[in-house]
A protein has these predicted regions:
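Consensus positions within tandem repeat domains that build extended binding/scaffold surfaces
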Residues: 18-23, 40-45, 63-68, 88-91, ...
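Structural signature of tandem-repeat unit edges
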Residues: 2-16, 26-38, 48-61, 71-86, ...
């Protein structure tokens, strides 16, 4: 809660940032994190003047809500490959200025509300290896298009709810579960294409204005007919 600290230079020996270490340090603009391997929960929550962070290949843990509410944070740099296995719940929640982010190889999970209300986020690259996208992970972001990895197994409830700029999404054959309202409220979403056959599909995953492309006679086909969604069948040559 220190409102005067503007810049912090960490010694190379500092490997961990503890819980709420810089919580609501509203004047903080600059801190070096290149040698840090663990950032605990709410470490930088509410640091509204923090604009840029660089995380090294040695980063192995980002605690829940660690950068939540950093409203001016517009540049998050990851190495292409890190030791990080998951983005915990709410890590970048309400970071309203992030426009683009490329997540590192090695990730298997994006937690609940990880990018919740990152309202400027238009472009995100998801690496192969991700298996789970959590509940409300990309709720009300500005994503226009996103390539889901072929390793993805689960899309959580409301994962892309109210992504009003999203126009098209292709669901990989690997996906087994899609939560309720996952793509609901996406007013510009023209089509959702299913390459496989999920075992579980939640309620009202799309608006009725969206077309679902799927295989004729599939479980998705039956789901769409039950919900009276628009259907377009994938051509035999495509399959």
């Amino acid at each position: 809660n220190n409102v005067k600290i503007k810049s912090v230079k960490l010694a190379d020996s500092v490997k961990e940032i503890g819980n709420q270490s810089f919580y609501n340090c509203t004047a903080l603009r600059d801190i070096n994190l290149e040698n840090v391997s663990q950032i605990r929960w709410e470490s930088f929550l509410g640091c509204v003047h923090l604009k840029e962070i660089t995380l090294s290949s040695g980063i192995r843990y980002l605690g829940r809500r660690s950068f939540s509410g950093c409203k001016r944070l517009n540049c998050v740099k990851f190495e292409k490959s890190t030791m990080l296995k998951g983005i915990e719940a709410g890590v970048f929640q309400n970071c309203e200025s992030i426009e683009k982010i490329s997540l590192p190889k090695g990730l298997t999970e994006i937690g609940n509300k990880a990018f919740y209300k990152c309202t400027s986020l238009k472009d995100i690259e998801l690496p192969e290896g991700i298996q789970v996208i959590g509940n409300e992970a990309f709720y009300q972001t500005a994503i226009q298009g996103i390539k889901l990895p072929s390793t993805l197994v689960e899309i959580g409830n409301s994962a892309f709810l109210k992504c009003r700029s999203l126009e098209f999404i292709q669901i990989p054959a690997s996906v087994k579960k899609i939560g309720r309202w996952s793509f609901h409220g996406c007013g510009q979403l023209k089509k959702v294409e299913f390459l496989g056959e999920p075992e579980e599909i939640g309620e009202w995953i799309i608006n009725k204005s969206t077309v679902i492309r799927c295989k004729k006679g599939s479980g998705i086909d039956a789901y769409c007919k039950e919900k009276e969604f628009q259907i377009e069948y994938i051509d035999e040559e495509y399959t």
